[in-house]
Structure formats: structure tokens, C-alpha cells
Amino acid sequence: MKRVSFVIFFMTIAAVVYGQEPAPAMLPLTLPDGKTLQVEVARTEETRALGLMFRTALTEDRGMLFIFEQPGLHRFWMKNTLIPLDMVWMDDRKRIIHIEYQVPPCKLDPCAVYGPSADSLYVLEVISGVASREQLRVGQTLTF
């Protein structure tokens, strides 16, 4: 009986641990003024596709950094995104090449698509207002 209880206990723990989503990778990202944000890293196709969808809140010291394998015309939409965002595109040197300020959630299809006309390798999403408040500008470099 003890052995059966132990096996059931072990299997229950294994099922709980196995079924949990891994915590997102967090990375400090430093803005040109020295302020540091903690950003979730979206490095895989799956995490990039999900992005910040279905989030109901995002604090000003948090964000999501999308990292792509290759530079390209990486465009974003706000489908299923519930909070307004600022989006910051960067090239392979982490230099800002384009900013979209105060992008609203998409309420009706088709959703607008946002992005630069030049290739980017990284995109930072933060809660709406952060890019203006931190005076982010094209040509500045972010550190991460």
C-alpha cells in the first residue's frame, strides 16, 4: 500500500510539473536615458505569434522583446491584444529605426498592420505612453 501511495504521489507531482508552462525568459533592457525595463523574450515562432495577446495589463517597467533569426520586414498587428502599446523596431545594431506610438487594440477585422519600411531584427513592445515619456527617437540605441 505504501508503494502504491508513493507511486501515485510521484505521478501527481510529475503531472503538475510537466503540465506547467515554463516561465518566460526575462531580460534587462536599458533605454538611452539609463532606465532599465524587464522584458519577456519572444524568440520562438510560437512566442512571437502569441506576443502580448490577451494580457489585460502591462506595467511601465515591463515589456516584450521580439528577437528574429534574420533581419526582415517584421510587421505587427493588434489582433486579440487588449491593451494599447508602443512598438519600437530596431536593426541588427539595436538602433531604433521606427516607432509606432499609442497603437490601439484591434476591435474589428481586418486589423491594421504596423511596421517600418526597412529591415529590423528586434521589436520592443511596451505599454502605450512609454516611448513618448522616455523620449525614444529613431537613431537611438537600446542595450540588452
Regions found by a protein language model. Give the residues of each.
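Compact, glycine-rich, soluble single-domain proteins
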Residues: 20-144
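Bacterial N-terminal signal peptides
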Residues: 5-15
